[in-house]
Amino acid sequence: MNFSIPTFVWTIINFLLLLVVLSYFLFKPVNEIIDKRSKDIEGDIEQARIDKDKAEELRIANEEEYKAAKKEGKIIVENYKAKAENVSEEIISDAHKEAEIIIERAKKEIQREREKAEYEIKNKTIELSLELSKKALERSIDEKMHRELIEEFISKVGN
């Protein structure tokens, strides 16, 4: 093979021209696309980092709200428990008062019934005594008859 300098120079010039044309039409647009894609990826990464930070802030805020709501719920439950205990104590107190009133009424009723029974017994005793005296005066009584009358009187008083 022959080496010719003019061919070699023309080949180098052609190669350089091809490089310039390729650089202008191929390498430059490809580099621009790659640069644009790199910037897009960096932007996406930065946006993802920002979104992650926001999500973390929201998670913390939600966690704090949850804790506050849980604490508030606990306070509400405790308040209702206290109110329920107060109502329960009030109901029990009212029931005790009502029971005392009923017991007092029952005692008064028993006392009235007792007084009534005593009055009736007293009247019955007087009646029986008068009847016994009447019978005693109507007959002449010996000791045996007197004992029978007393036993009859006691049995009537017992009934």
UniProtKB/Swiss-Prot annotation:
Its main location: membrane. It comes from the Bacteria. Keywords: ATP synthesis, Cell membrane, CF(0), Hydrogen ion transport, Ion transport, Membrane, Transmembrane, Transmembrane helix, Transport. CDD domains: ATP-synt_Fo_b (cd06503). It is a single-pass membrane protein. GO terms for molecular function: proton-transporting ATP synthase activity, rotational mechanism; proton-transporting ATPase activity, rotational mechanism. The chain crosses the membrane at residues 7-27. Signal peptide: none annotated. It is found in: Cell membrane. One of its GO terms (cellular component) is plasma membrane. InterPro entries: ATP_synth_b/b'su_bac/chlpt, ATP_synth_F0_bsu_bac, ATP_synthase_B_chain. F-type ATPases have 2 components, F(1) - the catalytic core - and F(0) - the membrane proton channel. F(1) has five subunits: alpha(3), beta(3), gamma(1), delta(1), epsilon(1). F(0) has three main subunits: a(1), b(2) and c(10-14). The alpha and beta chains form an alternating ring which encloses part of the gamma chain. F(1) is attached to F(0) by a central stalk formed by the gamma and epsilon chains, while a peripheral stalk is formed by the delta and b chains. HAMAP family: ATP_synth_b_bprime (MF_01398). Belongs to the ATPase B chain family. F(1)F(0) ATP synthase produces ATP from ADP in the presence of a proton or sodium gradient. F-type ATPases consist of two structural domains, F(1) containing the extramembraneous catalytic core and F(0) containing the membrane proton channel, linked together by a central stalk and a peripheral stalk. During catalysis, ATP synthesis in the catalytic domain of F(1) is coupled via a rotary mechanism of the central stalk subunits to proton translocation. Component of the F(0) channel, it forms part of the peripheral stalk, linking F(1) to F(0). This is ATP synthase subunit b. It comes from Clostridium novyi (strain NT).
